[in-house]
């Protein structure tokens, strides 16, 4: 459904998704997903099928669930994008999630993760530093 009246609700649903993971509220996490929701992690070649499998992944995360700082949520209709900083027990990762809805619920997500890295010197003459310094719990 591409009803523009759903856009504010969908933006809120995305926020609730990340807040539920961060807060360990797995009942709330399940509530924002379709029962057959699919999450893809292309960098590791993994696919999570079903809301319950998604819940189980986050329930069993070594070191606990990540903390998120949401930089931006943008989109409209059925397709949205969230840009985040995620702090895991093994470090900070920059994340982009492509989120697809079926009605008011999240039906598909594809998440891309990248660590920070030092900027190469050869580009220094043409670029300026741009630090995304959000802390977990902050949004930009």
Positions of PLM-derived features:
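C-terminal and inter-domain tail/linker signature
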Residues: 1-140
């Amino acid at each position: 459904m591409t009803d523009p009246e759903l856009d504010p609700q969908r933006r809120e649903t995305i926020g609730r998704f990340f807040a539920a993971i961060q807060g360990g509220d797995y009942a709330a996490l399940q509530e924002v997903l379709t029962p057959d929701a699919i999450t893809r992690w292309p960098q590791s070649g993994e696919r999570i099928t079903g809301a319950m499998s998604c819940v189980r992944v986050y329930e069993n995360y070594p070191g606990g669930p990540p903390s998120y700082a949401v930089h931006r949520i943008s989109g409209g209709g059925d397709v949205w994008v969230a840009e985040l900083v995620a702090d895991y027990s093994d470090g900070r990762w920059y994340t982009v999630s492509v989120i697809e809805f079926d009605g008011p619920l999240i039906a598909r997500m594809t998440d891309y993760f990248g660590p920070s890295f030092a900027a190469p010197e050869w580009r220094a003459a043409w670029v300026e530093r741009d630090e995304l310094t959000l802390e977990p719990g902050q949004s930009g």
